[in-house]
């Protein structure tokens, strides 16, 4: 007879002993709600509320005329503390993680940053969250979901994804004070961002002539698409968007229609972090990352360059080496030809040379614009045809299928329903593929990390374990042969 004993689950509660924390102010959920309520009430009495006045200034204005009442001690603790910890949070303030596994923490506290980083909007935001009129303004999804039988596996997968924090991100915009979230607009530039003027001033506390920043697109913060960019200062102080140089999207990693981009400024004066970012993240020093060029033209730029191909060739003729490389790939589609030119020029000359060439090419097209007329709108020709020919985007088949869609009548129930089913199925299968591909990529990386070349052999983990001769490597792994020919000649 075999019996299985229940094993207690492992739980982590990260603050092990609150008493050991120095200079943190602890409040229970109820205490904090009361303090917030009275603070907001008092701040509303302020005669001159002003976004640019710090919270402390506003409080001095108010409490110069009235007493802080019963919450005075609490406010002193908040101002004194290095951070404020609110404990015993109910799930309608701070949603739990949807999918629990053995590593899920049972955190029910929220750590707020130092008071100096708060502003009036932040206090209003906290008050709305903690003192919401409807007790259940946020539904505890994890509880509710577990009571619903979801027959469709994939949809359940997506709802219960272990990355699914329901509300947490709304805190992050306030708490991660080194980062600034903004909507993205495009700029025909190289490796540069132009953040809102106040975000630069607020971070550095003064005018800075030459700052640098990490930039990341928000939905899935991946390491590969993180770039180090130069920060250009915006002339207008009323512009709250971030303008991103088109070159800094490797390949098609970022579509920038209204995306969020996160900018984290690097510390000044130039520190070791700054140096490391230069070495690994800046196209001037490492133009090629894995198999991608760090700088890539987006489709609109490719289209404009294709339109001005004579000007491009005139520019390249002033650089014999670049022009020779350009002629090697004469029979390749224009968009791929640009990529190959930048890659080869980097390998033969230097990363900085490719960076500067990229910069020159963007200068050529800075005044271009695209105008669509009836020909494009009704005939799907004109600029569309040029766009396809340049290899920038789309294909003849895509235009044909668009025409076919336009011809579909509302009464063709069969066609419409088949398309709807197909699109749902492809959505679901692509979701599955993402999971499978992710696992494959991870596995390949784990294997490849242990491979290296020594004495013309490919070795795995140690020198004695030789897998094959270096001759077995496909040419993609080696220095491009047509460039070796250039050196030999």
From Swiss-Prot:
Membrane-spanning parts: none
Record keywords, A-Z: Transcription, Transcription regulation
Family according to the record: Belongs to the baculoviridae LEF-9 family.
Function as written in the Swiss-Prot or TrEMBL entry: Involved in late/very late gene activation.
Signal peptide positions on this chain: none
Pfam families referenced in this protein's UniProt entry, alphabetically: LEF-9 (PF05094)
Organism expressing this protein natively: Orgyia pseudotsugata multicapsid polyhedrosis virus
Gene Ontology biological process: viral transcription
Identification of the protein by name: Late expression factor 9
């Amino acid at each position: 007879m075999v019996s299985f004993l229940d094993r207690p689950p492992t739980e982590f509660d990260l603050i092990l002993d609150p008493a050991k924390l120095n200079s943190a102010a602890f409040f229970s959920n109820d205490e904090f709600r009361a303090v917030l309520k009275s603070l907001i009430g008092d701040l509303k009495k302020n005669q001159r509320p002003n976004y640019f006045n710090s919270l402390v200034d506003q409080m001095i204005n108010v409490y110069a005329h009235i007493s802080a009442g019963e919450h005075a001690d609490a406010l002193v603790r908040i101002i004194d503390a290095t951070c404020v910890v609110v404990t015993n949070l109910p799930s309608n303030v701070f949603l739990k993680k949807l999918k629990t596994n053995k590593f899920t923490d049972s955190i029910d506290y929220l750590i707020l940053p130092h008071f100096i980083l708060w502003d009036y909007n932040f206090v209003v935001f906290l008050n709305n969250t903690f003192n919401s009129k409807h007790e259940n303004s946020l539904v505890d999804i994890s509880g509710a979901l577990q009571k619903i039988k979801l027959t469709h596996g994939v949809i359940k997968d997506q709802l219960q994804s272990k990355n699914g924090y329901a509300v947490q991100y709304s805190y992050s915009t306030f708490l991660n004070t080194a980062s600034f979230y903004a909507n993205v607009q495009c700029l025909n530039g190289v490796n540069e961002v132009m953040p809102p003027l106040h975000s630069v001033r607020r971070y550095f506390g003064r005018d800075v002539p030459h700052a640098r920043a990490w930039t990341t697109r928000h939905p899935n913060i991946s390491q590969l698409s993180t770039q180090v960019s130069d920060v250009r200062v915006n002339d207008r102080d009323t512009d709250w968007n971030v303008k991103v140089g088109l070159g800094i999207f490797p390949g098609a990693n970022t579509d920038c229609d209204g995306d969020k981009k996160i900018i984290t400024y690097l510390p000044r004066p130039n520190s070791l972090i700054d140096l490391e970012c230069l070495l690994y993240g800046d196209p001037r020093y490492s133009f090629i990352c894995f198999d991608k060029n760090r700088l890539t033209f987006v489709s609109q730029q490719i289209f404009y360059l294709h339109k001005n191909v004579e000007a491009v060739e005139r520019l390249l003729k002033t650089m014999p080496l670049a022009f020779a490389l350009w002629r090697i790939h004469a029979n390749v589609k224009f968009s791929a030809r640009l990529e190959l030119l930048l890659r080869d020029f980097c390998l033969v000359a230097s990363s900085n040379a490719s960076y500067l060439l990229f910069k020159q090419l963007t200068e050529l097209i800075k005044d271009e614009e695209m105008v669509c007329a009836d020909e494009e709108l009704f005939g799907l020709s004109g600029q569309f045809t040029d766009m396809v020919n340049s290899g920038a985007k789309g294909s003849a088949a895509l235009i044909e299928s668009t025409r076919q869609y336009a011809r579909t009548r509302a009464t063709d129930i069969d066609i419409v329903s088949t398309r709807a089913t197909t699109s749902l199925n492809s959505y679901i299968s692509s979701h599955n593929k993402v999971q499978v591909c992710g696992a494959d990529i991870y596995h390949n990386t784990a294997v490849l990390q242990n491979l290296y070349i020594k004495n013309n052999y490919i070795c795995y983990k140690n020198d004695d374990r030789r897998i094959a001769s270096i001759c077995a490597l496909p040419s993609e792994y080696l220095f491009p042969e047509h460039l070796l020919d250039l050196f030999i000649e």
